[in-house]
UniProtKB/Swiss-Prot annotation:
Description of how the protein assembles with itself and partners: Interacts with Mlc.
Protein name: Mlc titration factor A
InterPro entries: MetalloPept_cat_dom_sf (IPR024079), MtfA_enterob (IPR057256), MtfA_fam (IPR010384), MtfA_N (IPR042252)
Organism: Escherichia coli (strain 55989 / EAEC)
GO cellular component: cytosol
Cofactor binding note from Swiss-Prot or TrEMBL: Binds 1 zinc ion per subunit.
Gene3D superfamilies listed in its UniProt record: Collagenase (Catalytic Domain), Glucose-regulated metallo-peptidase M90, N-terminal domain
Keywords noted in UniProt: Aminopeptidase, Cytoplasm, Hydrolase, Metal-binding, Metalloprotease, Protease, Zinc
Annotated positions binding Zn(2+): 111, 148, 152, 211
Obligatory cofactor(s): Zn(2+)
Gene: mtfA
Length: 265
């Protein structure tokens, strides 16, 4: 029987966090008990090291905090929590938020505009999220705001800016870039054929390599059945980097469900 880490060091003066309830979301159902235990251990440390800051009246309770921490730690389950160094706060709006965006065009003119954002991440600075999209990240649907922003953090460990190439060995970089750009081109071809709304992969992945890595990281964990057969070579690179195989988890979970169904009387 598994010994849950959050029960081992409870004291009479502490209120146990609702980890078992927090784990009961579709995205995490494929994890083994050992993986769940390891994930909770990381998430506990995450909550000790990072500050979750609710904004604009958003109410942050213990269950929400636990689920946010679990999603942050899923991508680094095998990499280690030190991969999430470089920020200390997570700012959480109740819904998508408006920011002032400044950008420079091809001839050097600077433009300012207000845009709606779901999340933001910088190399050194807080991660900004919104609860509506965090809730939508609980399902195994291919969308996951937290994993998207974590992927940007992992990406910037390789240099000053997000490039779509995480911190991997130098001999792997050329192959990674080749497969990533091939995926971007494939996604763009589908968009041109059927349109952004009908594309099977989020069109944002075709915008630049950094966004492609972040979007495909979402699919890696929450819709591996879409990612793996379409980009098998890149899939293997993601498996090697994250040291996880969500497709194998999905197959195991489906086999378990099928076995349970056949043994119901």
């Amino acid at each position: 029987m598994i010994k849950w880490p959050w029960k081992v060091q409870e004291s009479a003066h502490q209120t146990a966090l609702p980890w078992q309830e927090a784990l009961s979301i579709p995205l995490l159902t494929g994890l083994t008990e050992q993986e769940q235990s390891k994930l909770v251990t990381l998430a506990e440390r995450f909550l000790q090291q990072k500050r979750l800051v609710p904004l604009q009246g958003f109410e942050l309770d213990s269950l929400r905090s636990c689920r946010i921490a679990l999603l942050f730690c899923l991508p680094v389950l095998e990499l280690g929590l030190e991969w999430l160094d470089g920020f200390h706060e997570v700012l959480i709006y109740p819904a998508p938020f408006v920011v002032d965006d400044e950008w420079e065009d091809d001839i050097g003119l600077v433009h300012n505009q207000r845009i709606v954002q779901s999340g933001q991440s910088w190399q050194q600075g807080p991660i900004v999220l919104n609860w509506l999209d965090i809730q939508d990240s609980f399902d195994a649907s291919g969308f996951n705001l937290i994993i998207h922003e974590v992927a940007h953090k992992l990406d910037t460990r390789n240099g000053d800016r997000a490039s779509g190439v995480p911190f991997i060995s130098l001999r792997e970089v050329a192959g990674w870039e080749h497969d990533l750009h091939a995926a971007m081109n494939n996604i763009q071809e589908e968009i041109e054929l059927v349109g952004e709304n009908a594309a099977s992969i989020d069109a944002y992945a075709a915008s630049d390599p950094a966004e492609c890595f972040a979007v495909l990281s979402e699919y890696f964990f929450s819709a591996p059945e879409l990612f793996a057969p379409r980009f098998p070579s890149l899939w293997q690179r993601f498996c090697q980097f994250y040291q996880q195989d969500p497709l194998q988890r999905l197959h195991h979970a489906n086999d378990t469900d099928s076995f349970s169904a056949t043994n119901v009387h």
